[in-house]
From Swiss-Prot:
Primary site of residence: secreted
Name of this protein: Omega-conotoxin SVIB
Position of the signal peptide: 1-22
Subcellular compartments: Secreted
Cleaved propeptide residues: 23-45
Organism listed in the record: Conus striatus (Striated cone)
A single GO molecular function term of this UniProt record: toxin activity
Keyword Lyase among record annotations: no
Disulfide bonds: 46-61, 53-65, 60-71
Modified residues (Cysteine amide): 71
Amino acid sequence: MKLTCVVIVAVLLLTACQLITADDSRGTQKHRALRSDTKLPMSTRCKLKGQSCRKTSYDCCSGSCGRSGKCG
């Protein structure tokens, strides 16, 4: 009986500590993971060879936008 009460009190204390620290740590994460550049091509549609492109947007499937403004 005593052991059961001790275990219940310990679980309640640990749960309370978890809830207190979770509230205090919101928005204080220092090193957030940045979105990987490798995920960008997978999440957006790329343009096929010969379609118009911009060198600054990196939207060609081949990865290269030619001088003429078309995917290479």
